[in-house]
A protein has these predicted regions:
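Short flanking/linker segments adjacent to small metal-binding domains or redox-active Cys/His motifs
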Residues: 144-170
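Conserved C-terminal portion of the radical SAM core fold
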Residues: 1-44, 58-64, 108
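Accessory C-terminal segments flanking Radical SAM cores
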Residues: 40-152
Length: 170
C-alpha cells in the first residue's frame, strides 16, 4: 500500500513546519508531498502573497536528489532526501496544464476537465438515457479532446469564478 501525505503550505500559517512534516516520516515508506497554496474556489481567501513556492520549500532541505517522473502527467516534482521520497506540487509557480491528464466527476454527474473549472459537462443525462459504456467513453473522449482549460497558466488574466475544488474531489 502506497501512502502519500499531502500538505498545503501557506505563508503566515505553516511554512515553519515544512521540514518537521518530512522529519515525522523519516524511516517509513510514506511519501510526503508539499502543495503550493492554491486558489481552489471562493472560500479559502487565496492571495498570491501567501504562496510559498515549491522552489522556496526545496531550499529548506539540505540535500535533495531529483527523481524521474513515474508517468506522463505526474503532478509532483519528486526528490530523494536520503531514502525518503518528497514531492512538490507547483501548480501556481510552475503550471502543468499542458501535461494534465486528470478529469473529475462531481457527485451530481458533471465531468470537469480542470480542478479550476467554472462548469462541467453533464454525464448524468447520458447515463439516464441508458447510454452504453462505449457511448459514455466516446462522450468523455470528445469532451477531453475539445478542452481548452489552462487556468493555472492564465491565472490573473481574467476574473474567473471557480467551482469549489472540494465539490469535485480536489
Amino acid at each position: 500500500l502506497e501512502v502519500k501525505v499531502n500538505t498545503v503550505i501557506r505563508a503566515g500559517y505553516n511554512e515553519h513546519s515544512v521540514k518537521m512534516v518530512a522529519d515525522r516520516f523519516i524511516g517509513s515508506d510514506v511519501i510526503v508531498r508539499y502543495i503550493e497554496f492554491m486558489d481552489v474556489g471562493q472560500t479559502n481567501s487565496w492571495n498570491l502573497d501567501e504562496v510559498i513556492t515549491g522552489e522556496m520549500m526545496q531550499q529548506m532541505f539540505d540535500e535533495l536528489k531529483p527523481l524521474k517522473a513515474n508517468h506522463t502527467g505526474e503532478v509532483a516534482n519528486r526528490f530523494l532526501r536520503g531514502s525518503q521520497e518528497i514531492g512538490f506540487i507547483e501548480s501556481v509557480s510552475k503550471p502543468f496544464c499542458g501535461e494534465c491528464n486528470r478529469a473529475r466527476i462531481s457527485a451530481d454527474g458533471a465531468l470537469y476537465t480542470c480542478l479550476f473549472a467554472s462548469s462541467g459537462s453533464d454525464l448524468k443525462a447520458l447515463i439516464r438515457m441508458d447510454a452504453t459504456k462505449e457511448q459514455i467513453a466516446d462522450a468523455v473522449r470528445s469532451i477531453w479532446t475539445k478542452r481548452d482549460d489552462a487556468y493555472s497558466q492564465n491565472r490573473g488574466s481574467a476574473e474567473h469564478k471557480k467551482v469549489e475544488m472540494s465539490f469535485i474531489g480536489g
